[in-house]
Amino acid sequence: MKKKGGRKILGFMVKEEKEENRGSVEFQVFSFTNKIRRLASHLELHKKDFSSERGLRILLGKRRRLLAYLAKKNRVRYKKLISQLNIREQ
């Protein structure tokens, strides 16, 4: 992972970000994954932060729904995305 502008960006997403393709399902899942990882590390330190825990559950649900949509529409892109983001298949 590279650090760019205060955000972590995977190499394969840099190209898409430059093209302003922020509405794609892949970019949205990538963005949610970064937020989820950041919140998870926050919750390891602050175990009683229940509002952040709720936010994490909401983000997980949004990402799950987007992944289900992508898996239904294009299985190849779905498999590629989950392998690049290193998230397990659901």
UniProtKB/Swiss-Prot annotation:
Cellular location(s): Plastid, Chloroplast
Keywords: Chloroplast, Plastid, Ribonucleoprotein, Ribosomal protein
InterPro entries reported for this sequence: Ribosomal_uS15, Ribosomal_uS15_bac-type, uS15_NS1_RNA-bd_sf
GO cellular component: chloroplast; ribonucleoprotein complex; ribosome
Source superkingdom: Eukaryota
GO biological process: translation
A Pfam family reported for this protein in Swiss-Prot or TrEMBL: Ribosomal_S15
Gene3D superfamilies referenced in this protein's UniProt entry, alphabetically: S15/NS1, RNA-binding
Coiled coil location: none
Classification via SMART domains: Ribosomal_S15 (SM01387)
Single annotated GO MF: structural constituent of ribosome
NCBIfam families per UniProt: S15_bact (TIGR00952)
Family, as annotated: Belongs to the universal ribosomal protein uS15 family.
Subunit note: Part of the 30S ribosomal subunit.
Name this protein carries in UniProt: Small ribosomal subunit protein uS15c
Organism of this sequence: Lolium perenne (Perennial ryegrass)
Lineage per the UniProt record: Eukaryota, Viridiplantae, Streptophyta, Embryophyta, Tracheophyta
UniProt gene name: rps15-A
